[in-house]
Design a protein with these regions (language model features):
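Domain-length accessory/inserted modules outside core catalytic folds
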Residues: 1-109
Length: 109
């Protein structure tokens, strides 16, 4: 079953709604082999990011407001909701919600 997600692509920059079905789709959408999760303070949403983004030459990233996450996250970010049992659920946030949480795009040197 496909799950609604929000994809942030700092290279375009663009925020879009996507559908994912499992970890292979997450890997494909954020363009990595190994990803990690950043839990949002609402306890309901999780951002999937490239676990090696800061060491593999990724040039651009996203800086959220400090209450979401204090450091810039490298590369594309995929946001899903948590079903409370270790699985994914439809993201309840909108593109506008996400835009309000993003401080800007950063370049890593």
């Amino acid at each position: 079953m496909k799950t609604k997600a929000i994809l942030i692509d700092p290279n375009l920059p663009r925020i879009s709604t996507e559908r994912v079905d499992g970890f292979e789709d997450i890997q494909r959408m954020i363009g990595c082999r190994c990803f990690t999760c950043v839990r949002f303070p609402d306890g309901k949403h999780v951002a999937y990011v490239d676990d090696e983004g800061l060491i593999n030459g990724t040039e651009l990233g996203v800086k959220f407001i400090d209450s979401i996450y204090p450091d810039a996250l490298a590369g594309k970010i995929l946001i899903l909701a948590d079903d409370g049992q270790g699985g994914d659920a439809d993201c309840e946030l909108t593109g506008s919600d996400i835009q309000a949480m993003v401080k800007g795009i950063v370049r890593f040197s």
